[in-house]
Each structure stands twice: as C-alpha cells, then as structure tokens.
From Swiss-Prot:
It comes from Thermotoga petrophila (strain ATCC BAA-488 / DSM 13995 / JCM 10881 / RKU-1). One of its GO terms (molecular function) is structural constituent of ribosome. This is Large ribosomal subunit protein uL30. GO terms for biological process: translation. NCBIfam families: rpmD_bact.
Amino acid sequence: MPKKLKIKLVKSPIGYSWDQKDTVKRLGLRKLNQIVVKDDLPQIRGMIRKVRHLVEVEEIEEGGSNA
C-alpha cells in the first residue's frame, strides 16, 4: 500500500525567508497546528527537508485490510 505523510505545522514561518514561507504554503499549511496528509514522494520529502525546523512529520499507512 502507498505510504502517506502526516505533516503538522508546529512553528510559525514568520521571521524566516520568503522561500521557506512559500514552501510551507505549498505544502498546504496555513495555520499553526494544522495537519495535512500528503503522498510520500521525493518532491514532498524535499519540501519537508527545507522546513524541517517548522514541521513535525509522521508516516502513516493508507487504507485498511480487506478481509
């Protein structure tokens, strides 16, 4: 099953470069403690790496078992 990433904004990007603010915005994060779920792709991982001091990330499995 494809993996997903749960991304939570834990620190405000105010005071950081416009580049980092833009990355947070492109991840879909607008407010503190907001959580978004994204596909685990290299592009998303790169964005997270750029703002790793502002976010918390958790890997989750998508879907359940069909018994």
